[in-house]
């Protein structure tokens, strides 16, 4: 969310690194996550993250790919909100994620006494992606993740209205 890219490591990757061995990562594809709209006041970063994970995990659409968050919706969210979404992106099975930077990002670096670390990052005019995920932030509602993975994400109101239906879905998994 601050113009950087990191890759999470699991136990096997960490063990290889401790033994001085490398692990291969294929050149990843890049999926554009086009954010439009603005989250409602009662919607938090976890709701947005669960909506994304619910859309892409089970079909492996973003598996081992880089998510690039772009679009006018990015600027509608604070840095803390973006960070909240970003911490959950690994649950989508993506390799990593990167966000377009903006004035809020610049202010974040200034507040943290690192103004020289800010770099403008945005997609080029003719940017091409291996796929696109469109997220209209205006339509996101409070979500809940049921066992056994965050991709079992449903609107909270739906689960409250018919808990038996959603518990049955979870049991089938």
Where in the sequence are the language-model features?
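Fe-S-dependent hydro-lyases/dehydratases of central metabolism
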Residues: 1-173
């Amino acid at each position: 969310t601050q113009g950087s890219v990191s890759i999470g490591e699991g136990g096997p990757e960490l063990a290889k690194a401790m033994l001085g061995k490398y692990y291969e990562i294929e050149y990843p594809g890049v999926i554009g996550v086009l954010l439009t709209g603005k989250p409602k006041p009662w919607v938090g970063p976890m709701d947005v993250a669960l909506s994304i994970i619910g859309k892409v995990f089970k079909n492996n659409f973003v598996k081992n790919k880089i998510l690039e968050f772009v679009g006018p919706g990015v600027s509608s969210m604070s840095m803390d909100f973006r960070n909240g979404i970003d911490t959950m992106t690994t649950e989508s099975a993506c390799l990593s994620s990167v966000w377009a930077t903006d004035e809020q990002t610049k202010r974040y670096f200034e507040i943290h006494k690192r103004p020289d670390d800010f770099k403008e990052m945005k997609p080029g005019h003719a940017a091409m992606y291996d796929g696109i995920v469109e997220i209209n932030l205006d339509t996101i509602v409070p979500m809940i993740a049921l066992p056994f993975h965050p991709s079992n994400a449903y609107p909270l109101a739906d689960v409250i209205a018919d808990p038996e239906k959603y518990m049955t879905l979870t049991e089938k998994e």
